[in-house]
């Protein structure tokens, strides 16, 4: 029962990866439109696009970290909140 709940929780945590992918697509779409309008600002706009990409990707990495924590880190705790297998 607990394993199923952890799998559902990890799956829900990875939904943020889809949002990050949409955000990255929006960042580079805006970059292409902006460079097409004003090619002389291409270098400056590319720097802003890389910053936007990094921040969007950070959300996906945090979601992946949370999914791994849900799946693997919480298995070491018993029902009483103490480490499983630790001396009492």
From Swiss-Prot:
UniProt signal peptide: none
Main localisation: mitochondrion
Membrane topology reported for the UniProt record: Multi-pass membrane protein
GO molecular-function terms, A-Z: ATP binding; lipid binding; proton transmembrane transporter activity
GO cellular component: mitochondrial membrane; proton-transporting ATP synthase complex; proton-transporting two-sector ATPase complex, proton-transporting domain
Protein function: This protein is one of the chains of the nonenzymatic membrane component (F0) of mitochondrial ATPase.
Name of the molecule in the record: ATP synthase subunit 9, mitochondrial
Protein's organism: Beta vulgaris
């Amino acid at each position: 029962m607990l394993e199923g709940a952890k799998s559902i929780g990890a799956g829900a945590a990875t939904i943020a990866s889809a949002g990050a992918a949409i955000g990255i697509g929006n960042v580079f779409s805006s970059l292409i439109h902006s460079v097409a309008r004003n090619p002389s600002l291409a270098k400056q706009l590319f720097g802003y696009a890389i910053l936007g990409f990094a921040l969007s990707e950070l959300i996906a990495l945090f979601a992946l970290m949370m999914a791994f924590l849900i799946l693997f880190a919480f298995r070491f705790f018993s029902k009483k909140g103490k480490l499983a297998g630790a001396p009492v």
